[in-house]
């Protein structure tokens, strides 16, 4: 499959910050500061701190109060936001191209000059506790956090990104300062942008904004996930439906089989209407509305599972039908036409995702941040073309082995 990839402009500032820019034709500029500081980088008593820091970055800097931070881009119709993941934190902005420098300067101010006022920290604790409770009240969200805890046990990847009410309420200003001093270092940050400006102009803008930021290197190493055995858990709820995840650890993003497993997961229950779980369980039997499989590859390990919600009386039948589909993928190789269709489908999905410039450069920036390189789109397509039916059988037997699957149930009470 022949696809021409738009080139990225890459550069490094003297202090070690890396720049990645994708030039586009439209008037919109996307900017992001992506920091290699996620929830897996928290120490044992810091659960939820990466996310809490992200919230508090907007509460005041050496140059601005909260109102001025929030109004700086709102006043020109722009967008400013942030999110925290297991492996990184992202601060991002979207503006019309005349306001590129304004957005870049604001992101630098937030990321490098936040003061974390004590009064604002106290108020934000209750905001985050409310966020935690909102997720706990949503079983379709909460079960994914419980599943992570199940398969990663006491490893940082198993911790809830939001933390717990107790951990969040324990944070002080010193905790936030220690965390950012330890992890918000220049060699752990990529500045990602997309827009009509040239790469050279973008580089000049960033250069003028970092005159006072000295190079800081980090020697911190991440803890490996270790061994895993299947674990099963269940919890009674007051909800009407039963929610369930069956799953296992899978391949990390740096492992050879990760792309083949991405293809396999797409066949099983990916974001398409013709995936096997949808056609053979939802459409054929009408047992569930929400049924999907997911695959999250972190740098060194992955997380895979099948999630569904259904009437309590249907849950065991759905589980049996899911196991039937997994068994078929372990034992029966895809035919030539089936494999060709599956490859074209996932290649199309990947190519279409590149049309969103902000998403495209963000994905490339994360690859640069975590792996030190960016794989060209053309090379990804060629690797997909080389995936064989035999390799799919191999990865299916490694991950879909019945005795290796963990499960978590949030059992409902049925209709009232």
Q: Where are the regions a protein language model picked out?
A:
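Short acidic/glycine-enriched loop/turn segments that link adjacent beta-strands
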Residues: 5, 27, 87-88, 240, ...
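Charge-rich, well-structured scaffold segments of protease-associated domains
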Residues: 12, 66-224, 244, 251-252, ...
């Amino acid at each position: 499959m022949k696809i021409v990839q738009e080139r990225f402009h890459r550069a490094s500032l003297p202090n070690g910050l890396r720049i990645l820019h994708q030039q586009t034709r439209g008037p919109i500029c996307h900017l992001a500061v992506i920091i290699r500081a996620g929830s897996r980088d928290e120490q044992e008593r810091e659960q939820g701190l990466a996310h809490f820091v992200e919230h508090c970055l907007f509460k005041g800097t050496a140059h601005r109060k909260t109102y001025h931070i929030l109004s700086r881009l709102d006043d020109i119709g722009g967008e400013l936001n942030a999110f925290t993941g297991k492996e990184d934190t992202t601060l991002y902005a979207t503006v019309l191209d005349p306001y590129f420098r304004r957005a870049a300067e604001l992101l630098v101010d937030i990321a490098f000059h936040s003061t974390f006022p004590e009064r604002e920290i106290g108020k934000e604790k209750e905001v985050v506790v409310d966020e935690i409770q909102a997720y706990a009240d949503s079983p379709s969200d909460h079960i994914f956090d419980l599943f992570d805890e199940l398969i990663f046990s006491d490893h940082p990847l198993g911790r809830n990104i939001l933390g717990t009410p107790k951990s969040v309420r324990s944070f002080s200003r010193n905790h936030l300062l220690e965390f950012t001093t330890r992890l918000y270092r220049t060699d752990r940050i990529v500045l990602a942008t997309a827009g009509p400006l040239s790469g050279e102009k973008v580089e000049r803008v960033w250069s003028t904004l970092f005159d006072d930021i000295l190079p800081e290197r980090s020697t911190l190493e991440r803890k490996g996930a270790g061994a895993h055995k299947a674990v099963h858990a269940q919890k009674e709820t007051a909800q009407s439906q039963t929610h369930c995840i069956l799953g296992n650890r899978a391949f990390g993003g740096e492992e050879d089989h990760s792309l083949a497993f991405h293809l396999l997961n797409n066949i099983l229950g990916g974001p398409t209407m013709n995936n096997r779980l949808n056609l053979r369980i939802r459409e054929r039997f009408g047992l569930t509305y929400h049924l999907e499989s997911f695959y999250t590859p972190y740098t060194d390990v992955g997380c895979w599972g099948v999630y569904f919600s259904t009437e309590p009386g249907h849950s065991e039948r759905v589980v049996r039908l899911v196991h039937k589909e997994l068994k078929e993928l372990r034992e029966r190789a895809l035919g030539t036409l089936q494999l060709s269709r599956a490859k074209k489908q996932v290649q199309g999905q990947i190519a279409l995702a590149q049309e969103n410039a902000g998403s495209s450069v963000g994905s490339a920036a994360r690859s640069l941040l975590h792996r030190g390189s960016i794989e060209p789109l053309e090379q990804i397509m060629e690797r997909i073309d080389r995936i064989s039916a035999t390799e799919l059988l191999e990865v299916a037997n490694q991950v879909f082995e019945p005795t290796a699957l963990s499960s978590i149930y949030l059992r409902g009470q049925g209709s009232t």
